Amino acid sequence: MFRRTYFWLMLLPLFMVGCTGLPDHPTSVEWQSHQAKLSQIQSFQAVGKLGYMSPDQRQNLNFYWKHSPAQSNLRFTTFLGQTALNLTMTPQGARVETYDDQILTAANATALVQQLTGLVIPVEQLSDWIIGLPNGADDFQLNEQNTLSSLEKDLNFQRWHIAYTQYRDVEFHQQVVPLPAKLSLTQQDIKLNIVVSKWTLK
């Protein structure tokens, strides 16, 4: 009996160390239900505004985002309605049409946008994050309504922090789904404020 007890006491610290290494992600029934609804969204259209602040530049742009599994189109315009950037993303890569009718392609959409505009925007991850899905996140937290409050992700050795400050109820398949209306992305001294004024889901 003594040997058996001693054996389990020896294993206990190892078990506790193993447990502390597991990611502490929320797993409430309400969150799982909400996450399942979000995962059913195959296509969306989002219209809104983006504010970009960094030591090098400040930009205020309108955006129109049409996303589907096969193709995602993100267009930025100025307040005068002029197209600043027209980005198309597919599984094969990214393509940009500039205001002077140039067409540039690259395998990485984020790098292409930065190359052309100087703006650091994780556009490839945003298709999930903008609807409130923490896919690929290193960590995330929920609010009292069991929707995303924040998430964190390391991209190219840089830590991104995304905070969700406001949600809006949107109709989807004869039910109501809360989707982000305001969120902010921060990476060191870079900050993006995104306001979604209109959602259309399919």
Curated annotation (Swiss-Prot):
Q: Which InterPro entries match?
A: LolA/LolB/LppX (IPR029046), OM_lipoprot_LolB (IPR004565)
Instruction: Give the signal sequence positions.
Output: 1-18
Q: Give the record's GO CC terms.
A: cell outer membrane
Q: Where in the cell is it found?
A: Cell outer membrane
Coarse class of the protein's main subcellular location: membrane
Lipid attachment of type S-diacylglycerol cysteine occurs at which residues? C19
Q: A GO biological process this protein is involved in? A: protein transport
* Superkingdom field: Bacteria
* The family this protein is said to belong to: Belongs to the LolB family.
Recorded protein name is: Outer-membrane lipoprotein LolB
Species source reads: Vibrio vulnificus (strain CMCP6)
Name of the encoding gene:
lolB
